[in-house]
Amino acid sequence: MSQEVCFLIGFDGSILWADASNSPVALPDSRDRWEAIWQLRDELAEIAHSHPVGPSAFSAEDTSTMAALDAALGRKLRYSVVAPKTMIVRAEDETFELNPEPWWAGLLRLASGMK
């Protein structure tokens, strides 16, 4: 079964926190996730999540959530979507494909049930 998974990534590239949904196409808001983001805000560099059935793009919901997070934290984070064949990143208002990918991208695919 595939599912969307979220990793909170630290400035040193470590996975600070993770959670998963029960759906391959949605990662509903979670109080636990919001609390983790707030508690880890000084260490948090990036929020990554999977799109196990695609697309390799940020959704409208992703975009509005990213804007809300940046406003709440008072700074811009880096965001990424890991899809079956590619990884995209949004950093400083630019969106691009990332290659090579960080070490945790394969782990995110595995946790998401991607083939």
In which residue ranges do the predicted regions lie?
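Conserved beta-strand-loop surface patch within small alpha/beta domains used
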Residues: 1-44, 52-115
